[in-house]
Amino acid sequence: MAKGKGVRIVVTLECKTDQGVYRYHTTKNRRNTPNRIELKKYCPLTQQHEIFKEIK
């Protein structure tokens, strides 16, 4: 029997400064964070920490 949708989903984070160039993949709990997340991660293109925003 198949179960329903899980609580955790895989999301893609994209750099706001270099859009479409570098992305991270991570999971989030859809109950705790229903809105789009923004995380500060390392961008190897700019060689510094940048804000990465969740995309569809």
Curated annotation (Swiss-Prot):
GO cellular component: chloroplast; ribonucleoprotein complex; ribosome
GN (gene name): rpl33
Pfam hit, one: Ribosomal_L33
GO biological process: translation
UniProt entry tagged with the keyword Lipid biosynthesis: no
PANTHER family: 50S RIBOSOMAL PROTEIN L33, CHLOROPLASTIC, LARGE RIBOSOMAL SUBUNIT PROTEIN BL33C
UniProt keyword annotations, A-Z: Chloroplast, Plastid, Ribonucleoprotein, Ribosomal protein
Similarity annotation: Belongs to the bacterial ribosomal protein bL33 family.
PROSITE patterns in alphabetical order: RIBOSOMAL_L33
InterPro entries hit by this protein: Ribosomal_bL33, Ribosomal_bL33_CS, Ribosomal_bL33_sf, Ribosomal_zn-bd
GO molecular function: structural constituent of ribosome
Location in or out of the cell: Plastid, Chloroplast
Transmembrane stretches, start-end: none
Recorded superkingdom: Eukaryota
Stated name of the protein: Large ribosomal subunit protein bL33c
